[in-house]
Amino acid sequence: MTHVVLFHHALGQTPGFHAFADRLRAAGHKVTAPDLYAGATFTDLDEGVAHARSTGFDVVRQRGLDAAADLPDDVVWAGMSLGLMPAQTLAQTRPGARGALLLHGSVPPEALGSPWPSGLPAQVHVMEHDDWGDVDDCRALAAAQDEVELFLYPGAGHLFTDASSVDHDPAASDLLLERVLAFLQRVG
């Protein structure tokens, strides 16, 4: 069993987000899912991003860091889209992580103020033509780090793992989950 700390995307903790977390739990993993939005959820990505913007992206990120303060170090930090900000920050700055799962994009490590940790395994999952997912940043991270695997999926949907999102792609989501579970087995 691996402990996964999963940060939600800009739509908040939607039913599809919870369903994804439950699939990890059903495979035997412990999942902690901090709520960065204090219960708010959205069905439209632009509205969710507007909420994050009005709250302040730094505030949203800090909520994630604060939520992780009392959690153990030997976890897998996972973030979906907006949730990448706290997940990737913690993976890069908090020693002891087992790995990182960067779903629906990634952030250039230098934008978070520190390099990618040597030897830290990670997976990046994004659709090839995702306008929100910064595919070039994902490619650059994987090219620069031997421990980072990049998985590109056909299509343009952003939140394709969220069954309650208009972007949901069941086949891509199932393949992603298969790869994530293999990763968790390997690093656990």
Regions found by a protein language model. Name each.
Residues A78-A87:
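Gly/Ala-rich beta-loop-alpha elbow adjacent to hydrolase catalytic centers
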Residues T89-G99, P115:
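Conserved hydrolase catalytic core segment
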Residues T2-P72, F160-T161:
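Serine-hydrolase catalytic machinery in alpha/beta-hydrolase-like enzymes
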Residues F20, G133-A143:
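Short alpha-helix in the alpha/beta-hydrolase fold that links the catalytic acid
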Residues G96-V107, P121:
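A conserved short beta-strand
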Residues W116-A122, D146-E147:
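Short, proline-enriched alpha-helix->beta-strand connector loops that line the catalytic pocket
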Residues V124-V126, Y153:
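Short beta-strand/loop motif that positions the catalytic acidic residue
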Residues V148-G188:
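C-terminal catalytic histidine-bearing segment of alpha/beta-hydrolase fold enzymes
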